[in-house]
Amino acid sequence: MRRRMACLLLCLLFQHASAVRAEAPRNTSLLARLKWSQFRLVLGRIEVANIHSSQTRTATSGDEGDELVETLTISGDTDVPSVRYGRHDPTGSVAITVINGNRVEIDQTETAPEVVSVSFRQQPGTDMVLCIGDGTGSQTHHAPTLWHLLVTAPDACESHLLPLLELLQPSWQFGEMLSRATDELIREADASDFDKRHSARSLIAKLKSSDFSTRQQAQQQLGELGVGVLPYLNLIADSDLTREQQRRLEQVRVKLRGQVADTPERIALWLVEDERIWLSMLAHDELPIRVFAATHLAKRFEKPIDYDPEGTPLERQEQVARIRTRLVRR
């Protein structure tokens, strides 16, 4: 029964996204064509994988007056490396900047009514921010990673963000990646009972032990819990830790994060105990998805949660807000 529900969940959650991506025209950017730099997703964050030159390089496609003009500047020989791409056509302009490998700014400005202004920001250590439109009709979405953003705001991402990200790296294939990652996530959720966070609590306490070998062993065991413990570790405030605990936890985070590009299997292992992903699914339009998410989150509290997946949108919104408050306090 759960497996049938999982399959239905997959279809409902991502069939529209896959259709949209399959039908989208491919217009490879100058940035992608020249391949002077490659990008990767590491735990849902965009970063530069490499820059193929230690020098500053520039390129232009199109001349003034042409329908499409593109510019590209790659700075690999500066203290702070950067990638700057610009694109202008009769409908508007796009500017993409990647600074120091992981600070991403994307802006789309419109000159035609069919184009909507878009702003995307990725800054280290803070949530991503996606803004759609201007004025009173604008929408703003916040999420810790791109995968969270795709779940919490699928329509906004499909229509406005993903076409811009394809200018960076057309090979990312978001629709296919999301579908496969969700399949893996459902499998992991069936077997998960949020046990990693329980194990992590006692190990974190040992990181402030007066015995050096105890601290070393606890740090090693934290790393052995795998990438799935990262969402919990990222919730822990430095103010609740000693300096020794802070230092060792940061070493664990860095090692677990690594520089490995995201795969469906890695995404599932990482997100299976991530509360924000499952809270987002409680607000989904489709009932089977809400039911599955509520069942999985109940494992977090070790009892059913105060949530009615068949309630009205307003009732569910209020229930999710209360659940979110409970999670923050625990």
What are the residue ranges of the model-derived segments?
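Bacterial N-terminal signal peptides that target proteins for export
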Residues: M1-A6
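Bacterial N-terminal signal peptides
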Residues: C7-Q15
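An exposure/low-complexity boundary signal
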Residues: Q15-H16, T214
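Sec/Tat signal peptide C-region and signal peptidase I cleavage site
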Residues: A17-R21
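Extended repeat-based scaffolds of very large eukaryotic assembly and lipid-transport proteins
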Residues: E23-R330
